[in-house]
Amino acid sequence: MNLITTIIAITITLSAVLATISFWLPQMTPDAEKLSPYECGFDPLGSARLPFSLRFFLIAILFLLFDLEIALLLPLPWGDQLTTPALTLAWSAAVLALLTLGLIYEWTQGGLEWAE
């Protein structure tokens, strides 16, 4: 068997086993002690469950995606020196097109508007 095929088979098998085990493990029932915040033995001064802006979270996720895009496209000049630079450029264009379509979708859904 090919080395890549073996690695892919091991990865898929390990993922399936771990996913199956996680579904079979019992869920622990939360009680008041587990749900209360712990602050080094002292009573909490305020609420530990602060409200979090979902808009901020979405903007942060978009930032991470486009930061990853830059990391993926940085080695592009070295990819031009390969035997098939057209294939490298095609993959880069596909990544850019996919991210652009995602950005357009997020924009049309109103995810980039901070205040309503």
Swiss-Prot record:
Q: Per UniProt, which keywords does this protein have? A: Electron transport, Membrane, Mitochondrion, NAD, Respiratory chain, Translocase, Transmembrane, Transmembrane helix, Transport, Ubiquinone
Segments crossing the lipid bilayer: 3-23, 56-76, 85-105
| Enzyme class label | translocase
Which GO molecular function, any one, fits this protein according to its record?
Answer: NADH dehydrogenase (ubiquinone) activity
Q: Which domain of life is it from?
A: Eukaryota
Membrane topology type: Multi-pass membrane protein
- Disulfide bond residue pairs: none
Reaction catalysed by this enzyme: a ubiquinone + NADH + 5 H(+)(in) = a ubiquinol + NAD(+) + 4 H(+)(out)
Main subcellular localisation: mitochondrion
Q: Name one Pfam family in it.
A: Oxidored_q4
Q: What is its EC number?
A: 7.1.1.2
Compartment(s) where it occurs, according to its Swiss-Prot or TrEMBL record: Mitochondrion membrane
Q: Name one GO cellular component term.
A: NADH dehydrogenase complex
The keyword Cell membrane is assigned to this record: no
Signal peptide region:
none
What the entry lists under PANTHER family is as follows:
NADH-UBIQUINONE OXIDOREDUCTASE CHAIN 3
- Family as reported in the entry's similarity comment: Belongs to the complex I subunit 3 family.
Give the function comment from the record: Core subunit of the mitochondrial membrane respiratory chain NADH dehydrogenase (Complex I) that is believed to belong to the minimal assembly required for catalysis. Complex I functions in the transfer of electrons from NADH to the respiratory chain. The immediate electron acceptor for the enzyme is believed to be ubiquinone.
Task: Output this protein's name.
Answer: NADH-ubiquinone oxidoreductase chain 3
Tell me the name of the encoding gene: MT-ND3
